[in-house]
Amino acid sequence: MERYQQLFKQLAAKKEGAFVPFVQLGDPSPAMSLNIIDTLIAAGADALELGIPFSDPLADGPTIQNAALRAFAAGVTPAICFEILAEIRQKHPTIPIGLLMYANLVFHNGIDHFYQRCAEVGVDSVLIADVPFEESAPFRAAALRHGIAPIFICPPNADGDLLREIASHGRGYTYLLSRAGVTGAENHGQLPLNHLVDKLREYNAAPALQGFGISEPAQVKASLAAGAAGAISGSAIVKIIEKNVAQPVEMLVQLTRFVTEMKAATRS
């Protein structure tokens, strides 16, 4: 959890926002997945948001679903994902690592065991996409027991009560949803979200990162202008992977270019 606090402190000192890429662990293969993640970090990613492939992803658009299918085809399992996570942490001791996933995978070997494994491999935060705040108590209790930040999604229509709850129980960062629906670069993030960010700040919530539909530098700038601490981009990155599965060198070149441009947009 402290890694997020450190990161936001360092970025504030440099007057920068955070750029956080999302990829599926093991896509398109475990070895290539590690290459991709090293490339994202080298290109300027401030933190990582990583998915554990799941067969029935409710909040994911086709791009992220296909990434899960590629990982499954390469034989990726949750156990292999934890091995990849341990390797990332060993190579990159300070970068915040967040998981974005589904409840079934948390339940699989018991909630407590799941968070214990996260702590062992150096994961900092977990966001469970299909658990609404009002059902989150057992998850957030287990998370805090193991020093993992529970992350909550703040929807664009959140009322004052929900914002207070998220502020009081969330740690690490707050996932600010650009809009309702499924993920995807085509579905542009709707801005501005100033009123939500202001309220979250008033209630002392963890810094807000805006996600869903963030695919170009101008949107990163707009997120920061609305008061968010940074932006998360998933589908646009996973698309680059998808288009270049057969040409890994070109894939890494394009990922480097994309992350470099998105990170540049966080510098005022």
Curated annotation (Swiss-Prot):
It is an enzyme of class 4 (lyase). SUPFAM superfamilies: Ribulose-phoshate binding barrel (SSF51366). One of its GO terms (molecular function) is tryptophan synthase activity. The keyword Amino-acid biosynthesis applies. It catalyses: (1S,2R)-1-C-(indol-3-yl)glycerol 3-phosphate + L-serine = D-glyceraldehyde 3-phosphate + L-tryptophan + H2O. Coiled coil: none annotated. Its EC number is 4.2.1.20. Disulfide bonds: none annotated. The active site is at residues 49, 60. InterPro entries: Aldolase_TIM (IPR013785), RibuloseP-bd_barrel (IPR011060), Trp_synthase_alpha_AS (IPR018204), Trp_synthase_suA (IPR002028). Pathway: Amino-acid biosynthesis; L-tryptophan biosynthesis; L-tryptophan from chorismate: step 5/5. Keywords: Amino-acid biosynthesis, Aromatic amino acid biosynthesis, Lyase, Tryptophan biosynthesis. The keyword Translocase does not apply. GO terms for cellular component: cytosol. Belongs to the TrpA family. The alpha subunit is responsible for the aldol cleavage of indoleglycerol phosphate to indole and glyceraldehyde 3-phosphate. Tetramer of two alpha and two beta chains. This is Tryptophan synthase alpha chain. It comes from Yersinia pseudotuberculosis serotype O:3 (strain YPIII). The gene is trpA.
